[in-house]
């Protein structure tokens, strides 16, 4: 099985595991872009995960105007569409929050962290293909959590019982990604991602930075 097929299979398994979970209030809406934006995420994997890597960049979870819209980690619209070249169809989640509509590549809002990250990569590398030769970007958790008001709720704010179940499957997915791509480094974007990488990859011989 090819590297990209292994990564796709791991993502599908993670998506299925997450879809079986329930989350209590104040969480009222949960988006899983590995579900409704799967064609775009699969296209991303097929372009980005075809070689072993030197570095894997790890984020916490999708932002409302990034991966939630595009299916690509830190997926700022213009970077996903114009630099990476993603053009797959993106549908809507079943329980869409009226204040957080999914507009896909037509979304007019910009993910600030994604604009910075992919902007940095596009300045350093002449093409996305060149970047993906040795680098990959993935989120630890694929889910977006919202409260009744539409406020974003990050995974570190979940109850301990909810977090324990979710973190287990997310850690297992991260382990599979790193085991498959064999990077020298995992670079965490933020303290939460760094903590999860240290836990999930504890028995692998790998460098973890932030």
Task: Map each language-model feature to its residues.
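A polyanion-binding, active-site-adjacent surface
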Residues: 2-185, 194-198
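Flexible loop residues that form catalytic
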Residues: 191
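Glycosyltransferases and closely related glycan-assembly transferases
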Residues: 200-204
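Short, flexible loop segments at boundaries between secondary-structure elements
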Residues: 205-210
């Amino acid at each position: 099985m090819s590297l990209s097929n292994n990564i796709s299979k791991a993502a599908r398994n993670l998506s299925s595991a997450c879809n079986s979970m329930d989350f209590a209030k104040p969480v009222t809406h949960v988006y899983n872009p590995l579900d409704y934006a799967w064609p775009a995420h699969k296209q991303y994997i097929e372009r980005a995960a075809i070689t072993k890597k030197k570095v894997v960049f790890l984020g916490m979870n999708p932002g409302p105007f990034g991966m939630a819209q595009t299916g690509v980690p830190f997926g700022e619209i213009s970077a996903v569409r114009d630099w990476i070249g993603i053009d797959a169809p993106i549908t809507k989640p079943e329980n869409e929050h009226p204040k957080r509509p999914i507009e896909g590549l037509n979304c007019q809002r910009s993910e600030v962290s994604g604009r910075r990250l992919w902007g940095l990569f596009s300045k350093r590398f002449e093409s996305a293909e060149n970047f993906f030769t040795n680098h990959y970007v993935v989120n630890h958790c694929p889910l977006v959590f919202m409260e009744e008001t539409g406020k974003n709720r990050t995974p570190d704010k979940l109850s301990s019982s909810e977090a324990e179940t979710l973190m287990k499957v997310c850690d297992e997915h991260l382990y599979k990604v790193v085991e498959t791509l064999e990077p020298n480094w995992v670079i965490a974007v933020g303290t939460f991602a760094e903590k999860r990488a240290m836990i999930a990859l504890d028995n692998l011989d790998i460098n973890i930075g932030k």
